[in-house]
Amino acid sequence: YHSGGNGSLVELDGLINILQDYSLELNFARSQTEEGYLNFLDTTDTFGSHTYQMDGEKFSGRAHNIRLRRVVEGSYSGLRHKDVSPTYRSNVGLVGKNNYKERSYWHGRTFRTDGAFRKITIHASKQNRLNFQDQKTRERLETRLNIETSFNINGVFEFVTKASEKFEGKQFSKQDEIKLAFEYSPSETFMLGFRY
């Protein structure tokens, strides 16, 4: 950089297919950062033992993503562990947030028939997120029902419970969201939709 400082990022990615129905996705990254001395940030805020000011500090960070998925005819499941340390930096801009550890689980089933309801999909997922101080910043449960019919009407019903969410230091209480959508498309050139 013109004002001094430098950064490096090393990442190892992998996708492993296990048997016929499973896949394991792995991403491991490590960053090394040395800040420049052009301090255009007028702040005294800190992250860990470091400042946000451009004052020549050196630090390293890490990021991990491990996801195991199973997909078979009519069913899918998965679990994911992801963490990004507070000092992780990605100069290519692929990581917009750091300082979190997240666990996610999901499962879905699809039923197909030759009747009026051609396809019905039921999906459920759970997400927990903590920061590196082990404070809960998000807990989310989502259920969704998708329906496709033989008379060109499709529908989605989604219910989301955010049991806990923290944003900029403020803890929000439990929030429930309901989404309802219908779509009628009798031809490729006409579609009528409703969302709530």
Describe the residue ranges of each PLM region.
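Exposed, low-structure sequence patches enriched in small/polar residues
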Residues: 7-9, 15-18, 22, 28-196
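A conserved hydrophobic secondary-structure block that centers on an alpha-helix together
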Residues: 1-5
